[in-house]
Amino acid sequence: MMKTSVMFMLVVVISLMCSSEAQEVARTYCGRDLADTLADLCFGVEKRGVAQYAPYFWTRQYLGSRGKRGVVDECCFRPCTLDVLLSYCG
């Protein structure tokens, strides 16, 4: 009986942790707030080398609307998540 209760509580705690991570809140980041958040998120992220950009020059015409917008368009003019901001690191 005790083992079942502990197991049930463990399952409940794990599922609550997973659901809270999946529900990341989108918000707007503008000005200094945007710059500071990007600096904090991107600290230690490896910079991309020139070789990694080579395909970019050949496929630029095939990029979706994301290739035409910037971080301000995506995160200041409308809410975005930290995952979107992380995509601008490097």
Swiss-Prot record:
InterPro entries: Bombyxin, Bombyxin_B, Insulin-like, Insulin-like_sf, Insulin_CS, Insulin_family. Pfam families: Insulin. It is found in: Secreted. SUPFAM superfamilies: Insulin-like. Belongs to the insulin family. One of its GO terms (molecular function) is insulin-like growth factor receptor binding. Disulfide bonds join 30-76, 42-89, 75-80. Heterodimer of a B chain and an A chain linked by two disulfide bonds. It comes from Bombyx mori (Silk moth). The keyword Glycoprotein does not apply. Residues 1-20 form the signal peptide. Silk worm has two kinds of PTTH: 4K-PTTH and 22K-PTTH; there are many forms of 4K-PTTH. Brain peptide responsible for activation of prothoracic glands to produce ecdysone in insects. One of its GO terms (biological process) is regulation of muscle cell differentiation. It comes from the Eukaryota. One of its GO terms (cellular component) is extracellular space. This is Bombyxin B-6. Keywords: Cleavage on pair of basic residues, Disulfide bond, Hormone, Secreted, Signal. Residues 49-67 form a propeptide.
